[in-house]
């Protein structure tokens, strides 16, 4: 266990040493929440208000709070998955620069080596998505806060589960990759495709029947965000 911990610390130090990767990872949630609030808020609001019958009147605060919950759930669903591909770059870098050859001839099992990569990815991703979580709570507070302490803890628990899933997914996909270009290409595909699949870029009701009826990670977040009605 001490060996795994040492490998995890080593991988985390490499992540913080690469200022470009660290800055990109930290700024991504900020950019996402600005883009979501600027461009997607109106799309979600129009989709929500269009489904309300004319004889029913709902306050703007309730509508804004519901839309903000949808946007933050979408952001967390995307960020928890895509950020892990960025912070897991150390795994591929070690293969590209030949460091893995040194590990392979050392008296350390490959299982411990990969466990060190996985744990460092989880820790770094939790740090980045923790920032996104705080920003989302601030956005909810500004638009229409309605959650209690238990709701916040459940959403935090959902975030941890998604980070574990994203770290596992990125570790599996990154396993056969040997260059940074390959990981960048995979990360781009995952970022674009996953955002649409989980309904982050547009309301799922606008999709076809297959995606409309399939559960997504965003549903888990929304299920933890009760309606203020």
Please tell me what each predicted stretch does.
Residues 110, 118-194:
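Alpha-helical transmembrane segments and their short interhelical loops
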Residues 212-220:
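Conserved small/polar residues in nucleotide/adenosyl-binding loops
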Residues 34-43, 174-211:
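Transmembrane helix segments
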Residues 1-8, 211:
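Short, membrane-interfacial amphipathic segments enriched in basic
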Residues 48-63:
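Perimembrane loop-to-helix junctions flanking transmembrane segments
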